[in-house]
Amino acid sequence: MGPAALACRTHPAERSRQLATKKDSPATPRPSGGAGVHPADRHDLIRVEGARVNNLQDVTVDIPKRRLTVFTGVSGSGKTSLVFGTIAAESQRLINETYSSFVQGFMPSMARPDVDRLDGLTTAILVDQERMGANVRSTVGTVTDTNALLRILFSRLGQPHIGPPNAFSFNVASVRGAGAITVEKAGGKKVEKRTFERAGGMCTRCEGTGNVTDFDLNELYDASLSLNDGALRIPGYSMDGWYGRIFRGCGYFDPDKPIAKFTKRELDDLLHRDATKIKVEGINLTYQGLIPQIQKSFLSKDVEAMQPHVRAFVERVITFTACPDCDGTRLNERARSSRIDGVNIADACAMQISDLAEWLRGIEDPSVAPLLSGLQHTLDSFVQIGLGYLSLDRSSGSLSGGESQRTKMIRHLGSSLTDVTYVFDEPTIGMHPHDIARMNDLLLQLRDKGNTVLVVEHKPEVIEIADHVVDLGPGAGSEGGQVTYQGPVAGLAASDTVTGRHLGDKAAVKATTRDRTGVLEVRGATTNNLTGVDVDIPLGVLVVVTGVAGSGKSSLIHGSVSNRDGVVAVDQSPIKGSRRSNPATYTGLLEPVRKAFAKANGVKAALFSANSEGACATCNGAGVVYTDLAILAGVSTPCEDCEGRRFQAEVLDYRLGGLNIAEVLDLAVSDAVGFFAEGEARIPAAHKIAERLNDVGLGYLRLGQALTTLSGGERQRLKLATHLGGPGEVIVLDEPTTGLHLANVEHLLEMLDKLVDGGRSVIVIEHHQAVMAHADWIIDLGPGAGHDGGQIVFEGTPADLVAAATTLTGKHLAAYTA
């Protein structure tokens, strides 16, 4: 075989090394090491030995560098713990240690993962599913630096010329000043008048947020009560805490006087007073009126990123309307007056990104050629990655987890870095099968530049392009954490692992469908890109809403259905959970259990809470003691007094059904179902919640397991189980297969059938073909994304969709069920 043939069979990531080798002179002595191999070329593996993070059971695995490795396994098997919690975490920790101790003091401290040995690590770049931008000022344009490039472009080419790039920024306010200064010249002093002006683009009325707010004072407080009697209805504003001490000590009003009897001055001080220094109980504090305080503490965050109870308060009390001065563009009139070819910067940011890219191609000016090239590359990357339907003024907090992850990828697509480890967490989340091929091309591009690409993924389409596969299992939680297979994809398909058995799964289109019991009428829907959509959504059946990303699925369902009475919506927003939160506290299961313990033992229920009176005094109910080591990573050690059980010793003497409260919290969900079903420990309310957790496939979780240890898929199903207990007759689910293994999807379908057979209507927004094939009715939106979508392109049964095969969804479903 000739050299040309050998080159054709060489992996792309190895070609750069071969080129470098060819440049070596024959006279150049090679370092000792035998076999003519350069010592530096021996480090071709990332070696993990004895990993024990979360549920990993002394995992040892070798991962090839400069290859695409996909990590598979059922949800909760330990994939994220190995890739993110071990490999990526240690890489980032080692990089942080290269900075000076002064710089490290400003960086988050990271503990070393529980692993015996890690070799061959390179710089890790994490691209995860975390949503972006809790700040109300954060947009798609700001997080990708595209806005900055646009501002420079308009400052150079915009007519009329209004100033530097800051003049087009909605985060910079215009400032003007004047005064006299003393200037010393030639030994003499002279007073001169000087003025200065900083041009900013911020709209002064909405302060660059694009919205103005109107407060419903009746929802803010009960005017018939005094402050001391609990008039305030604001989350966290308790008179028992610091707010109460400030209100009582400020002297601006009488806290025992009903608010309805306040004078105009007192009411203004309560609601609108500017920040004022006061002294309360000998402590210097700042008093501020309720409305500016709420704007500062609540409205500085994006509504989508708020905790549920805070979000409910904001939606109840505050009405958001587009700013009348800037029409929601965030920019002042001066910034909007400068134009390029009739387009101002607000118009450009409001364009669909694919349209903006085309508009920029029409601008030809040698003076800004490098700027246009960089801007064009970024916008083309959006289109290439399947996000061309977004606009730069879209709030980053409104992006789904999948959209956020792909937006983060934009920064890396044009990077010239090589020998970097890229780590992705299910990059195909929220992607239609039609878009997955483009994502695969991007992953291969990163690999072919000589990078190591590690991907946690469930989709067969991504697994099939892998150079190497690591499968974890065999089960989830304590039943997982082991490497069940590692090697090429062909070997995985032939292996007897859960993933191997399901890799080639094909779904059969449902032969018989249920009959509808009624319809939900939607008429003239125009949310976002919807074009006056009229549709009747069947009730009493399983309805699946499909379409490419950006086609209008969420706009139709969340904009026209989710807010109706009797509808319970489970969206993709992440659940909030600290290291003290666990499935028992999050679902409300612990409350009836505490009451049952109290009743059985004749004591207070507060004793059976690790966050209240029953908490171990040494660790405050955390189960571990945290030691702060300043710039070094903090250390957590099991509490010696309670031995990690979180409760006082005397509390553990009280029993119910033969178990104390710590032992109950250590039960697996599947065991808890039986424990709460009969005997002394029979607690119907707790039994019902445990059953729901078991039904969504979380039977392996422990009731007291910290939420911070759960994977993304586990958290999604935990949230789903909580909402399933609601009173709604119609349940809306937004991509419930997120984070689910192929085997777990079967359990999800069984649960959906159980809901429908129980008399509920289920509407699912989904891309997974197995869910589509199982539907009673499909509503397909498209034909494309953004302004190319927003129309109903098909309504009917899965069999009819496959038979017609005229839409993108129909073609992919036909291929999946063939």
In which residue ranges do the predicted regions lie?
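Conserved catalytic segment of ABC-fold P-loop ATPases
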Residues: 452, 464-471, 754, 761, ...
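P-loop/Walker A nucleotide phosphate-binding surfaces of NTP-dependent enzymes
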Residues: 8, 14-398, 404-423, 442, ...
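H-loop/switch region of ABC-family ATPase nucleotide-binding domains
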Residues: 456-458, 765-767
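Walker B catalytic acidic pair
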Residues: 425-427, 734-736
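Helix N-cap at the start of a conserved alpha-helix in ABC-type nucleotide-binding domains
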Residues: 432-437, 741-746
